């Protein structure tokens, strides 16, 4: 007989009904407080402090005391969890008009940056890697009352008011991980992950017993399951709670298998640096770090569960769940304010909307038909919280208490009950009424986000203490537009727009690359985040009426740039090869020519190219000087 996918029946048929009394009756309700990465008992909180200072994972700090974690996915955008911000509307997050200021700080020890941000009127300080937020978007599904703000649709994006030019960015995986052929006793599904975040810490036994110190911590784990909260509730408590959205999930294993609260929720063994998440980690990345040649983000942290009244939060036996990015990839692409733009082949004006086309975001990843991690987007929209997710579930839910009295697992991918290591082939009689005790929808789920009980400035000067705790999978993608963020869109002009949430103005920032053959003529004032020219037959002509400002830097790798107006770069102008000419003004900290040619005025034309900054011309570069009549000549004025 086929074993029905009902955990109470599964466990009862395996001859174990006491689990329902010991676990279901002791399941805990939500606690509205926060914690951070917690190591196993073989390590101290100091041991797991991240030794890399700035790595693209940062702390989110609301000036009303809320702490979360986020990940930089481009120089302007951080991805994190909706429940960190969805208690307010987007216009409520502001440094003016009584709004709540928000910042992300990316140093491993974020305290100095956050204190500076508060002390200096909520200003970005790139030297301390702290950035003020000028807009926030969160997924509307997280506002559904049953979601309790974090159980599904828990994804958000923040826009930085200044590009984080020197902070590393992360790639995001928009494909579901493939189900393994089998679940291993030691490695589970076989996917090694890194968990990281800011906030509370402690030990495997004591849980989140140490307060937030604003330092980033990191630990390792095996991915335990791609499955829903309903899968867990059905297995442990006998009935689903109505939470069908798949989540990436991990558990916190006791390396010694002695802790009474650790019943090995997901089949795998503890790793040497095994750790669990806690509050302050909310929104932090689940990093797939060994499956491919590069690390990539699978999801953002929403929350965790504990299963006994006596069990400390974030201790051995607890589990954590992450929102899979593949379910929300199209929402992410749409709400990402950053656009990569390039030109179509042929000559055209910068101001001609038909001259431009959006390029594929270089940080978007999918798994191709060969199983390789490649730059790309899926061919159909994400299922979201309520669509039909066609991903294959994987992982085994287990009840293997430390006293050795039981060994029951359920494979969510194959719908198989496993007793003492063997698939169940028949039914055993329940010792007690299997359906007698269940857990209501939200019990056992612990929200991971922390609100400090004191003013933000005070909490930064001492250890923070917590308060009491429709099927779219087969639908074709729409036509690419600038708004939906799909590559291949046209009908726009690259020129940065700062968001104004109170007026419904959507922010847009551009990274522009000229690679196609043809000349782009700029005769207006334009500001973008970054400019690159890489095509040998590409050219940019800035007329005397034109002005280009790059908020980060300029990479002149090939092709021609003529500046008769002005070109201003916050960062350096790097001339690898190609021609830089003109009679205008170039402003940059450094103009560095490696193998390029600099021709003031232009080849065959006498003129002065002014450089407001430093100029470095290596031995491989060429300075082309024209000599005119009456002693006139080109001038490179530095």
Regions of interest found by a model, annotated:
Residues 2-79, 87-100, 401-402, 406:
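Protease-domain processing segments flanking chymotrypsin-fold serine proteases, especially trypsin-like
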Residues 37-42, 48-50, 67, 72-86, ...:
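C-terminal subregion of chymotrypsin/trypsin-like serine protease catalytic domains
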Residues 38-52, 95-185, 189, 196-201, ...:
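Conserved catalytic-core segment of clan PA serine endopeptidases
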Residues 54-56, 66-68, 74, 100, ...:
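Residues that flank catalytic or metal-binding motifs in active/ligand-binding sites
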Residues 138-146, 154-170, 226, 273-310, ...:
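Extended amphipathic secondary-structure runs
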Residues 152-155, 161-274:
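Chymotrypsin/trypsin-fold serine protease catalytic domain
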Residues 343-352, 360-558, 562-565, 569-570, ...:
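Extracellular beta-sheet-rich ligand-binding/adhesion modules
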Residues 576-638:
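Extracellular beta-strand/loop-rich repeat segments of large surface/secreted proteins
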């Amino acid at each position: 007989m086929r074993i029905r996918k009902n955990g109470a029946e599964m466990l009862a048929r395996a001859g174990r009904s006491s689990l329902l009394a010991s676990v279901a009756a002791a399941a805990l309700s939500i606690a509205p407080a926060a914690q951070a990465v917690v190591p196993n008992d073989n390590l101290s909180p100091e041991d797991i402090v991240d030794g890399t200072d700035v790595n693209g994972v940062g702390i989110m700090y609301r000036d009303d005391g809320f702490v979360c974690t986020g990940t930089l996915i481009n120089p302007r955008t951080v991805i994190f969890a909706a429940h960190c911000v969805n208690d307010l509307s987007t216009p409520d997050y502001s440094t003016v008009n009584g709004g709540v200021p928000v910042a992300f700080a990316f140093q491993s020890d974020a305290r100095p940056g956050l204190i500076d941000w508060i002390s200096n009127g909520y200003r970005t300080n790139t030297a301390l890697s702290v950035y003020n937020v000028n807009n926030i978007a969160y997924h509307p599904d997280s506002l559904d009352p049953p979601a309790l703000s974090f159980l599904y649709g828990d994804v958000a994006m923040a826009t930085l008011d200044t590009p984080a030019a020197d902070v590393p960015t992360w790639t995001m995986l928009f494909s579901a991980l493939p189900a393994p052929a089998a679940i291993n006793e030691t490695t589970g599904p076989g996917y090694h992950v890194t968990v990281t975040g800011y906030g509370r810490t402690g030990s495997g036994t004591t849980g989140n017993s140490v307060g937030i110190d604003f330092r980033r911590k990191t630990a390792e784990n095996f991915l335990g399951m791609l499955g829903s909260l309903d899968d867990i509730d059905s297995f442990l408590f006998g009935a689903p709670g109505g939470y069908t959205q798949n989540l990436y999930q991990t558990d916190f294993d006791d390396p010694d298998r002695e802790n009474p609260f650790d019943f090995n929720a997901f089949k795998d063994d503890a790793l040497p640096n095994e750790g669990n998440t806690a509050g302050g980690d909310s929104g932090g990345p689940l990093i797939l770090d060994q499956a491919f040649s590069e690390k990539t983000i699978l999801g953002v942290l929403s929350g965790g569960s504990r299963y006994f009244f006596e069990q400390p939060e974030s201790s051995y036996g607890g589990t954590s769940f992450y929102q899979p990015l593949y379910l929300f990839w199209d929402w992410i692409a749409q709400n990402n304010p950053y656009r990569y733009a390039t030109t179509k082949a042929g000559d055209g004006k910068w101001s001609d909307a038909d001259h431009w086309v959006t390029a594929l975001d270089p940080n978007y990843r999918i798994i191709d038909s060969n199983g390789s991690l490649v730059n790309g987007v899926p061919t159909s929209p994400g299922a979201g919280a309520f669509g039909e997710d066609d991903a294959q579930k994987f992982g085994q839910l287990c009840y293997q208490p430390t006293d050795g009295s039981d060994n029951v697992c359920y494979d969510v991918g194959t719908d198989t009950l496993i007793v003492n290591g063997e698939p169940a082939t028949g039914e055993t009689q329940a010792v007690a009424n299997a359906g007698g005790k269940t857990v209501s929808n939200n019990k056992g789920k612990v929200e991971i986000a922390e609100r400090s009980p004191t003013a933000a400035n005070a909490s930064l000067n001492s250890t923070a203490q917590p308060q009491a705790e429709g099927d779219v999978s087969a639908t074709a993608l729409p036509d690419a537009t600038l708004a939906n963020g799909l590559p291949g869109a046209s009908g726009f002009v690259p020129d940065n727009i700062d968001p104004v949430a109170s007026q419904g103005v959507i922010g847009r920032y551009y990274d522009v690359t000229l690679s196609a053959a043809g000349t782009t003529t700029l005769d207006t004032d334009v500001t973008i985040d970054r400019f690159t020219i890489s095509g040998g037959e590409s050219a940019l002509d800035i007329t005397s009426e034109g002005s280009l400002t790059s908020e980060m830097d300029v990479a002149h790798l090939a092709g021609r740039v003529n500046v008769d107006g002005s070109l201003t770069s916050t960062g350096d102008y790097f001339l690898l090869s190609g021609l830089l000419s003109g009679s205008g003004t170039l402003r940059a900290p450094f103009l560095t020519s490696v193998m390029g040619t600099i021709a003031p005025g232009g080849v065959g034309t006498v003129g002065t190219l002014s450089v407001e900054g430093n100029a470095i011309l290596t031995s491989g570069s060429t300075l082309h000087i024209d000599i005119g009549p009456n002693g006139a000549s080109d001038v490179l004025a530095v």
